[in-house]
A protein has these predicted regions:
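Acidic, low-complexity mobile loops and tails
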Residues: 1-56, 89, 93-130
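Histidine-anchored, small-residue-rich loop motif
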Residues: 71, 85, 106
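ATP/adenylate-binding site constellation spanning eukaryotic-like Ser/Thr protein kinases
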Residues: 71-74, 118
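Residue-level recognition of beta-strand microenvironments
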Residues: 17-19, 63, 80-83
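Small beta-strand-rich domains/subdomains or short beta-sheet motifs embedded
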Residues: 9, 43, 60-61, 66-72
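Charged, amphipathic alpha-helical coiled-coil/dimerization segments
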Residues: 74, 78-79, 85-92
């Protein structure tokens, strides 16, 4: 079973979100990285770009496929994980730590955004396994 961290929120499209002081740190879940297989390239978003929740924001390429990453919340890109350019495999080895992809400065209340709790996300993953 893939690891689902209780201190994070999730999107149905398998991104995780850590909210702190109006900043959302985003990566892909352990479930998503397992499904993708070995990550070989991460196309990062551009700094200062604005996105709405659900917008395509980045791309992860694995040995299996290229997968779009979506903005789970609305905001402006304030940081990207440039280390992934040299070490994209961090998305596999540490999806919740060194494998974070980008950070957004929130542009609206998170309560209005359709994020899942860890429990809801775990149930979603379980339902997709069957």
């Amino acid at each position: 079973m893939a690891e689902v961290r209780s201190n994070l929120n999730y999107a149905a499209s398998h991104e995780w979100v850590e909210l702190k002081d109006g900043i959302a740190t985003v990566g892909i879940s352990d479930y998503a990285q397992e499904a993708l297989g070995d990550v070989v390239f991460v196309e990062l978003p551009e700094m200062d770009q604005q996105f709405q929740a659900g917008d395509e924001i980045a791309v992860i390429e694995s040995v299996k496929a290229a997968s779009d990453i979506y903005a789970p919340v609305a905001g402006i890109v304030v940081a990207v994980n440039e280390a992934l350019e040299a070490e994209p495999e961090a998305v596999n080895s540490a999806p919740y730590e060194a494998g974070w992809i980008f950070k957004l400065s929130l542009s609206e209340s998170v309560a209005e955004q359709n994020l899942l709790t860890a429990e809801q996300y775990a149930a979603l993953c379980e339902s997709q396994d069957h």
